[in-house]
């Protein structure tokens, strides 16, 4: 899985990991901060949250166009510094009056702009690593690994947010509403780490940088010119995929919206036994070690199996010790956001292994089929939520209160299913864009991928506005949206497979 990948992949992935750690630390508590600090309703907080996400994913369109003109590396560097300024403003406690709202909006715009310059362009650079015929067959696996490392940062983010807030409240006597700003400050530190990694290991991916406009024009002329009809066909197919992506992200990013509301209002606030262990990120890391070590045993021969076997024994011993000493733990709503990235990391080698095995047999489904399957799997997650919450009382959207003690594993299972969907759609979709997009439109096409994600994230607010209705209304709506999107993509699958 890790062998035969270009060295630049690891440098770019780790630089992105640092940035994503900060972003998800902020995002883990953001919607709760809006309600705690400003006293807004679930619908209002959800609208602000989804509008921010929309900006984060819309501005890569501008970032992609700028990179096509001035170069990817320059835009990535500028993006990191702009994001840093945004997170710095968010980390300042300003109260809850009009000036505080103005500063928050300015900070969110800076974070969005910086992300727009950074995120998409970094991923285009990753795609360009695989233009070398030596690595061409490893493109999908490479993007899956890239996506996995992003989630390393995301997995630790909720715990970091909760721990830093608890420390601020207990050790410094900071109020809960002001302690959120300490979580936002973590993002500033993570960006310093990110830019350091980017420049320290720049030599590993320097050959894909297009900072010289003259060089870009020269290389473009040297490339075989694609026929206008083929260019049009590829762009149309990409736009059709973008249309489906909108509805996936609308459903998926409920993890920071209605699913977080559900965790706060309906999930048990404490746990014991195995469930309590699930809430500790170190136990999740031990489980990940077991998965990767099992993969190592299957892949290696002879003495190569010894180290993975030792790691499995050590991880099992660690988990056994923790189980014998586990006590009741309190459950905070943001902690559930650690499960999706944990599952991404754990399941990535499984996903790569399955599709690698199918590829050897000549039966690996093409990217559009994987995307359609991802939408079906996402609908199953919300089918689970629909059927298991029918007996619960309707939530209070205006004055949030704890109304039930649902088993936390309902949400854990939902996140697991959504992760299966994500692995089928997100890294595969990004790989599809870098493969299918005409060379001279790569930057703008990657930007449009994020633009579609932006629209989906803006639509995240619709279920938050439904919050307050019966549960089957909220979750059933999301289930139906995913199913319709799946039917659409399978109805045009021949057209999409043609350009794959």
Residue ranges, per PLM feature:
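Hydrophobic core of transmembrane alpha-helices in multi-pass small-molecule transporters
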Residues: 17, 86, 99-121, 394-424
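Glycine-rich segments within core transmembrane alpha-helices of 12-TM secondary carriers
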Residues: 56, 138-169, 183-194, 281-282, ...
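Cytoplasmic membrane-interface "Motif A"-like loop-to-helix N-cap segments
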Residues: 68-83, 137, 299-308, 357-376
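C-terminal ends and interior cores of transmembrane alpha-helices
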Residues: 79-99, 316-326, 356, 373-403
């Amino acid at each position: 899985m890790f062998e035969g990948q270009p060295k630049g992949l690891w440098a770019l992935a780790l630089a992105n990991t640092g940035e994503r750690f900060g972003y998800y630390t902020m995002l883990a508590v953001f919607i709760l901060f809006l309600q705690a600090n400003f006293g807004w309703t679930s619908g209002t907080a959800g609208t602000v949250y989804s509008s921010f996400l929309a900006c984060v994913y819309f501005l890569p369109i501008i970032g992609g166009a700028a990179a096509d003109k001035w170069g990817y590396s320059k835009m990535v560097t500028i993006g990191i510094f702009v994001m840093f300024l945004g997170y710095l403003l968010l980390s300042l406690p300003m109260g809850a009056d009009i000036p505080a709202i103005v500063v928050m909006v300015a900070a969110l715009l800076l974070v969005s702009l910086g992300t727009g310059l950074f995120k998409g362009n970094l991923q285009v650079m990753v795609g360009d690593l695989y233009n070398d015929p030596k690595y061409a067959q490893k493109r999908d696996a490479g993007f899956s690994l890239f996506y996995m490392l992003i989630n390393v940062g995301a997995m630790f983010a909720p715990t970091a947010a909760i721990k830093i807030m608890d420390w601020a409240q207990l050790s410094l006597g900071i109020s809960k509403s002001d302690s959120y700003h300490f979580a936002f400050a973590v993002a500033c530190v993570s960006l310093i780490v990110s830019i350091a990694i980017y420049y320290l290991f720049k030599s590993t991916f320097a050959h894909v940088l297009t900072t010289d406009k003259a060089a870009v024009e020269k290389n473009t002329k040297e490339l075989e010119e694609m026929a206008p009809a083929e260019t049009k066909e590829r762009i149309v197919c990409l736009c059709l995929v973008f249309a489906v992506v909108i509805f996936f992200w609308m459903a998926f990013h409920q993890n920071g919206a209605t699913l977080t509301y559900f965790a706060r209002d309906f999930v048990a606030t404490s746990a014991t036994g195995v469930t309590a262990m699930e809430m500790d990120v170190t136990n999740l890391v031990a489980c990940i070690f077991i998965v990767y070590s099992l993969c190592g045993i299957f892949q290696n021969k002879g003495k190569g199996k010894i180290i993975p076997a030792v790691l499995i024994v050590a991880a099992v011993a660690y988990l056994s010790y923790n189980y014998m000493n586990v006590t009741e733990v309190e459950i905070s709503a943001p902690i559930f956001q650690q499960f999706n990235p944990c599952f991404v990391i754990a399941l990535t080698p499984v996903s790569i292994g399955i599709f690698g095995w199918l590829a050897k047999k000549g039966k690996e489904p093409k990217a559009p089929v994987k995307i359609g399957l991802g939408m079906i799997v996402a609908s199953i997650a919300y089918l689970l939520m629909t059927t298991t919450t029918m007996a619960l009382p309707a939530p209070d959207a205006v004055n949030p209160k704890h109304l039930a003690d649902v088993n936390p594993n309902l949400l854990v299972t939902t996140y697991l299913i959504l992760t299966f969907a994500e692995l089928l759609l997100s890294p595969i979709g990004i790989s599809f864009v870098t493969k299918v997009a005409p060379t001279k439109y790569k930057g703008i096409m990657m930007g449009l991928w994020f633009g579609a994600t932006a629209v989906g994230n803006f639509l995240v607010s619709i279920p938050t506005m439904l919050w307050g209705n019966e549960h089957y209304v909220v979750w059933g709506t999301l289930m139906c949206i995913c199913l319709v999107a799946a039917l659409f993509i399978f109805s045009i699958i021949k057209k999409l497979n043609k350009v794959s």
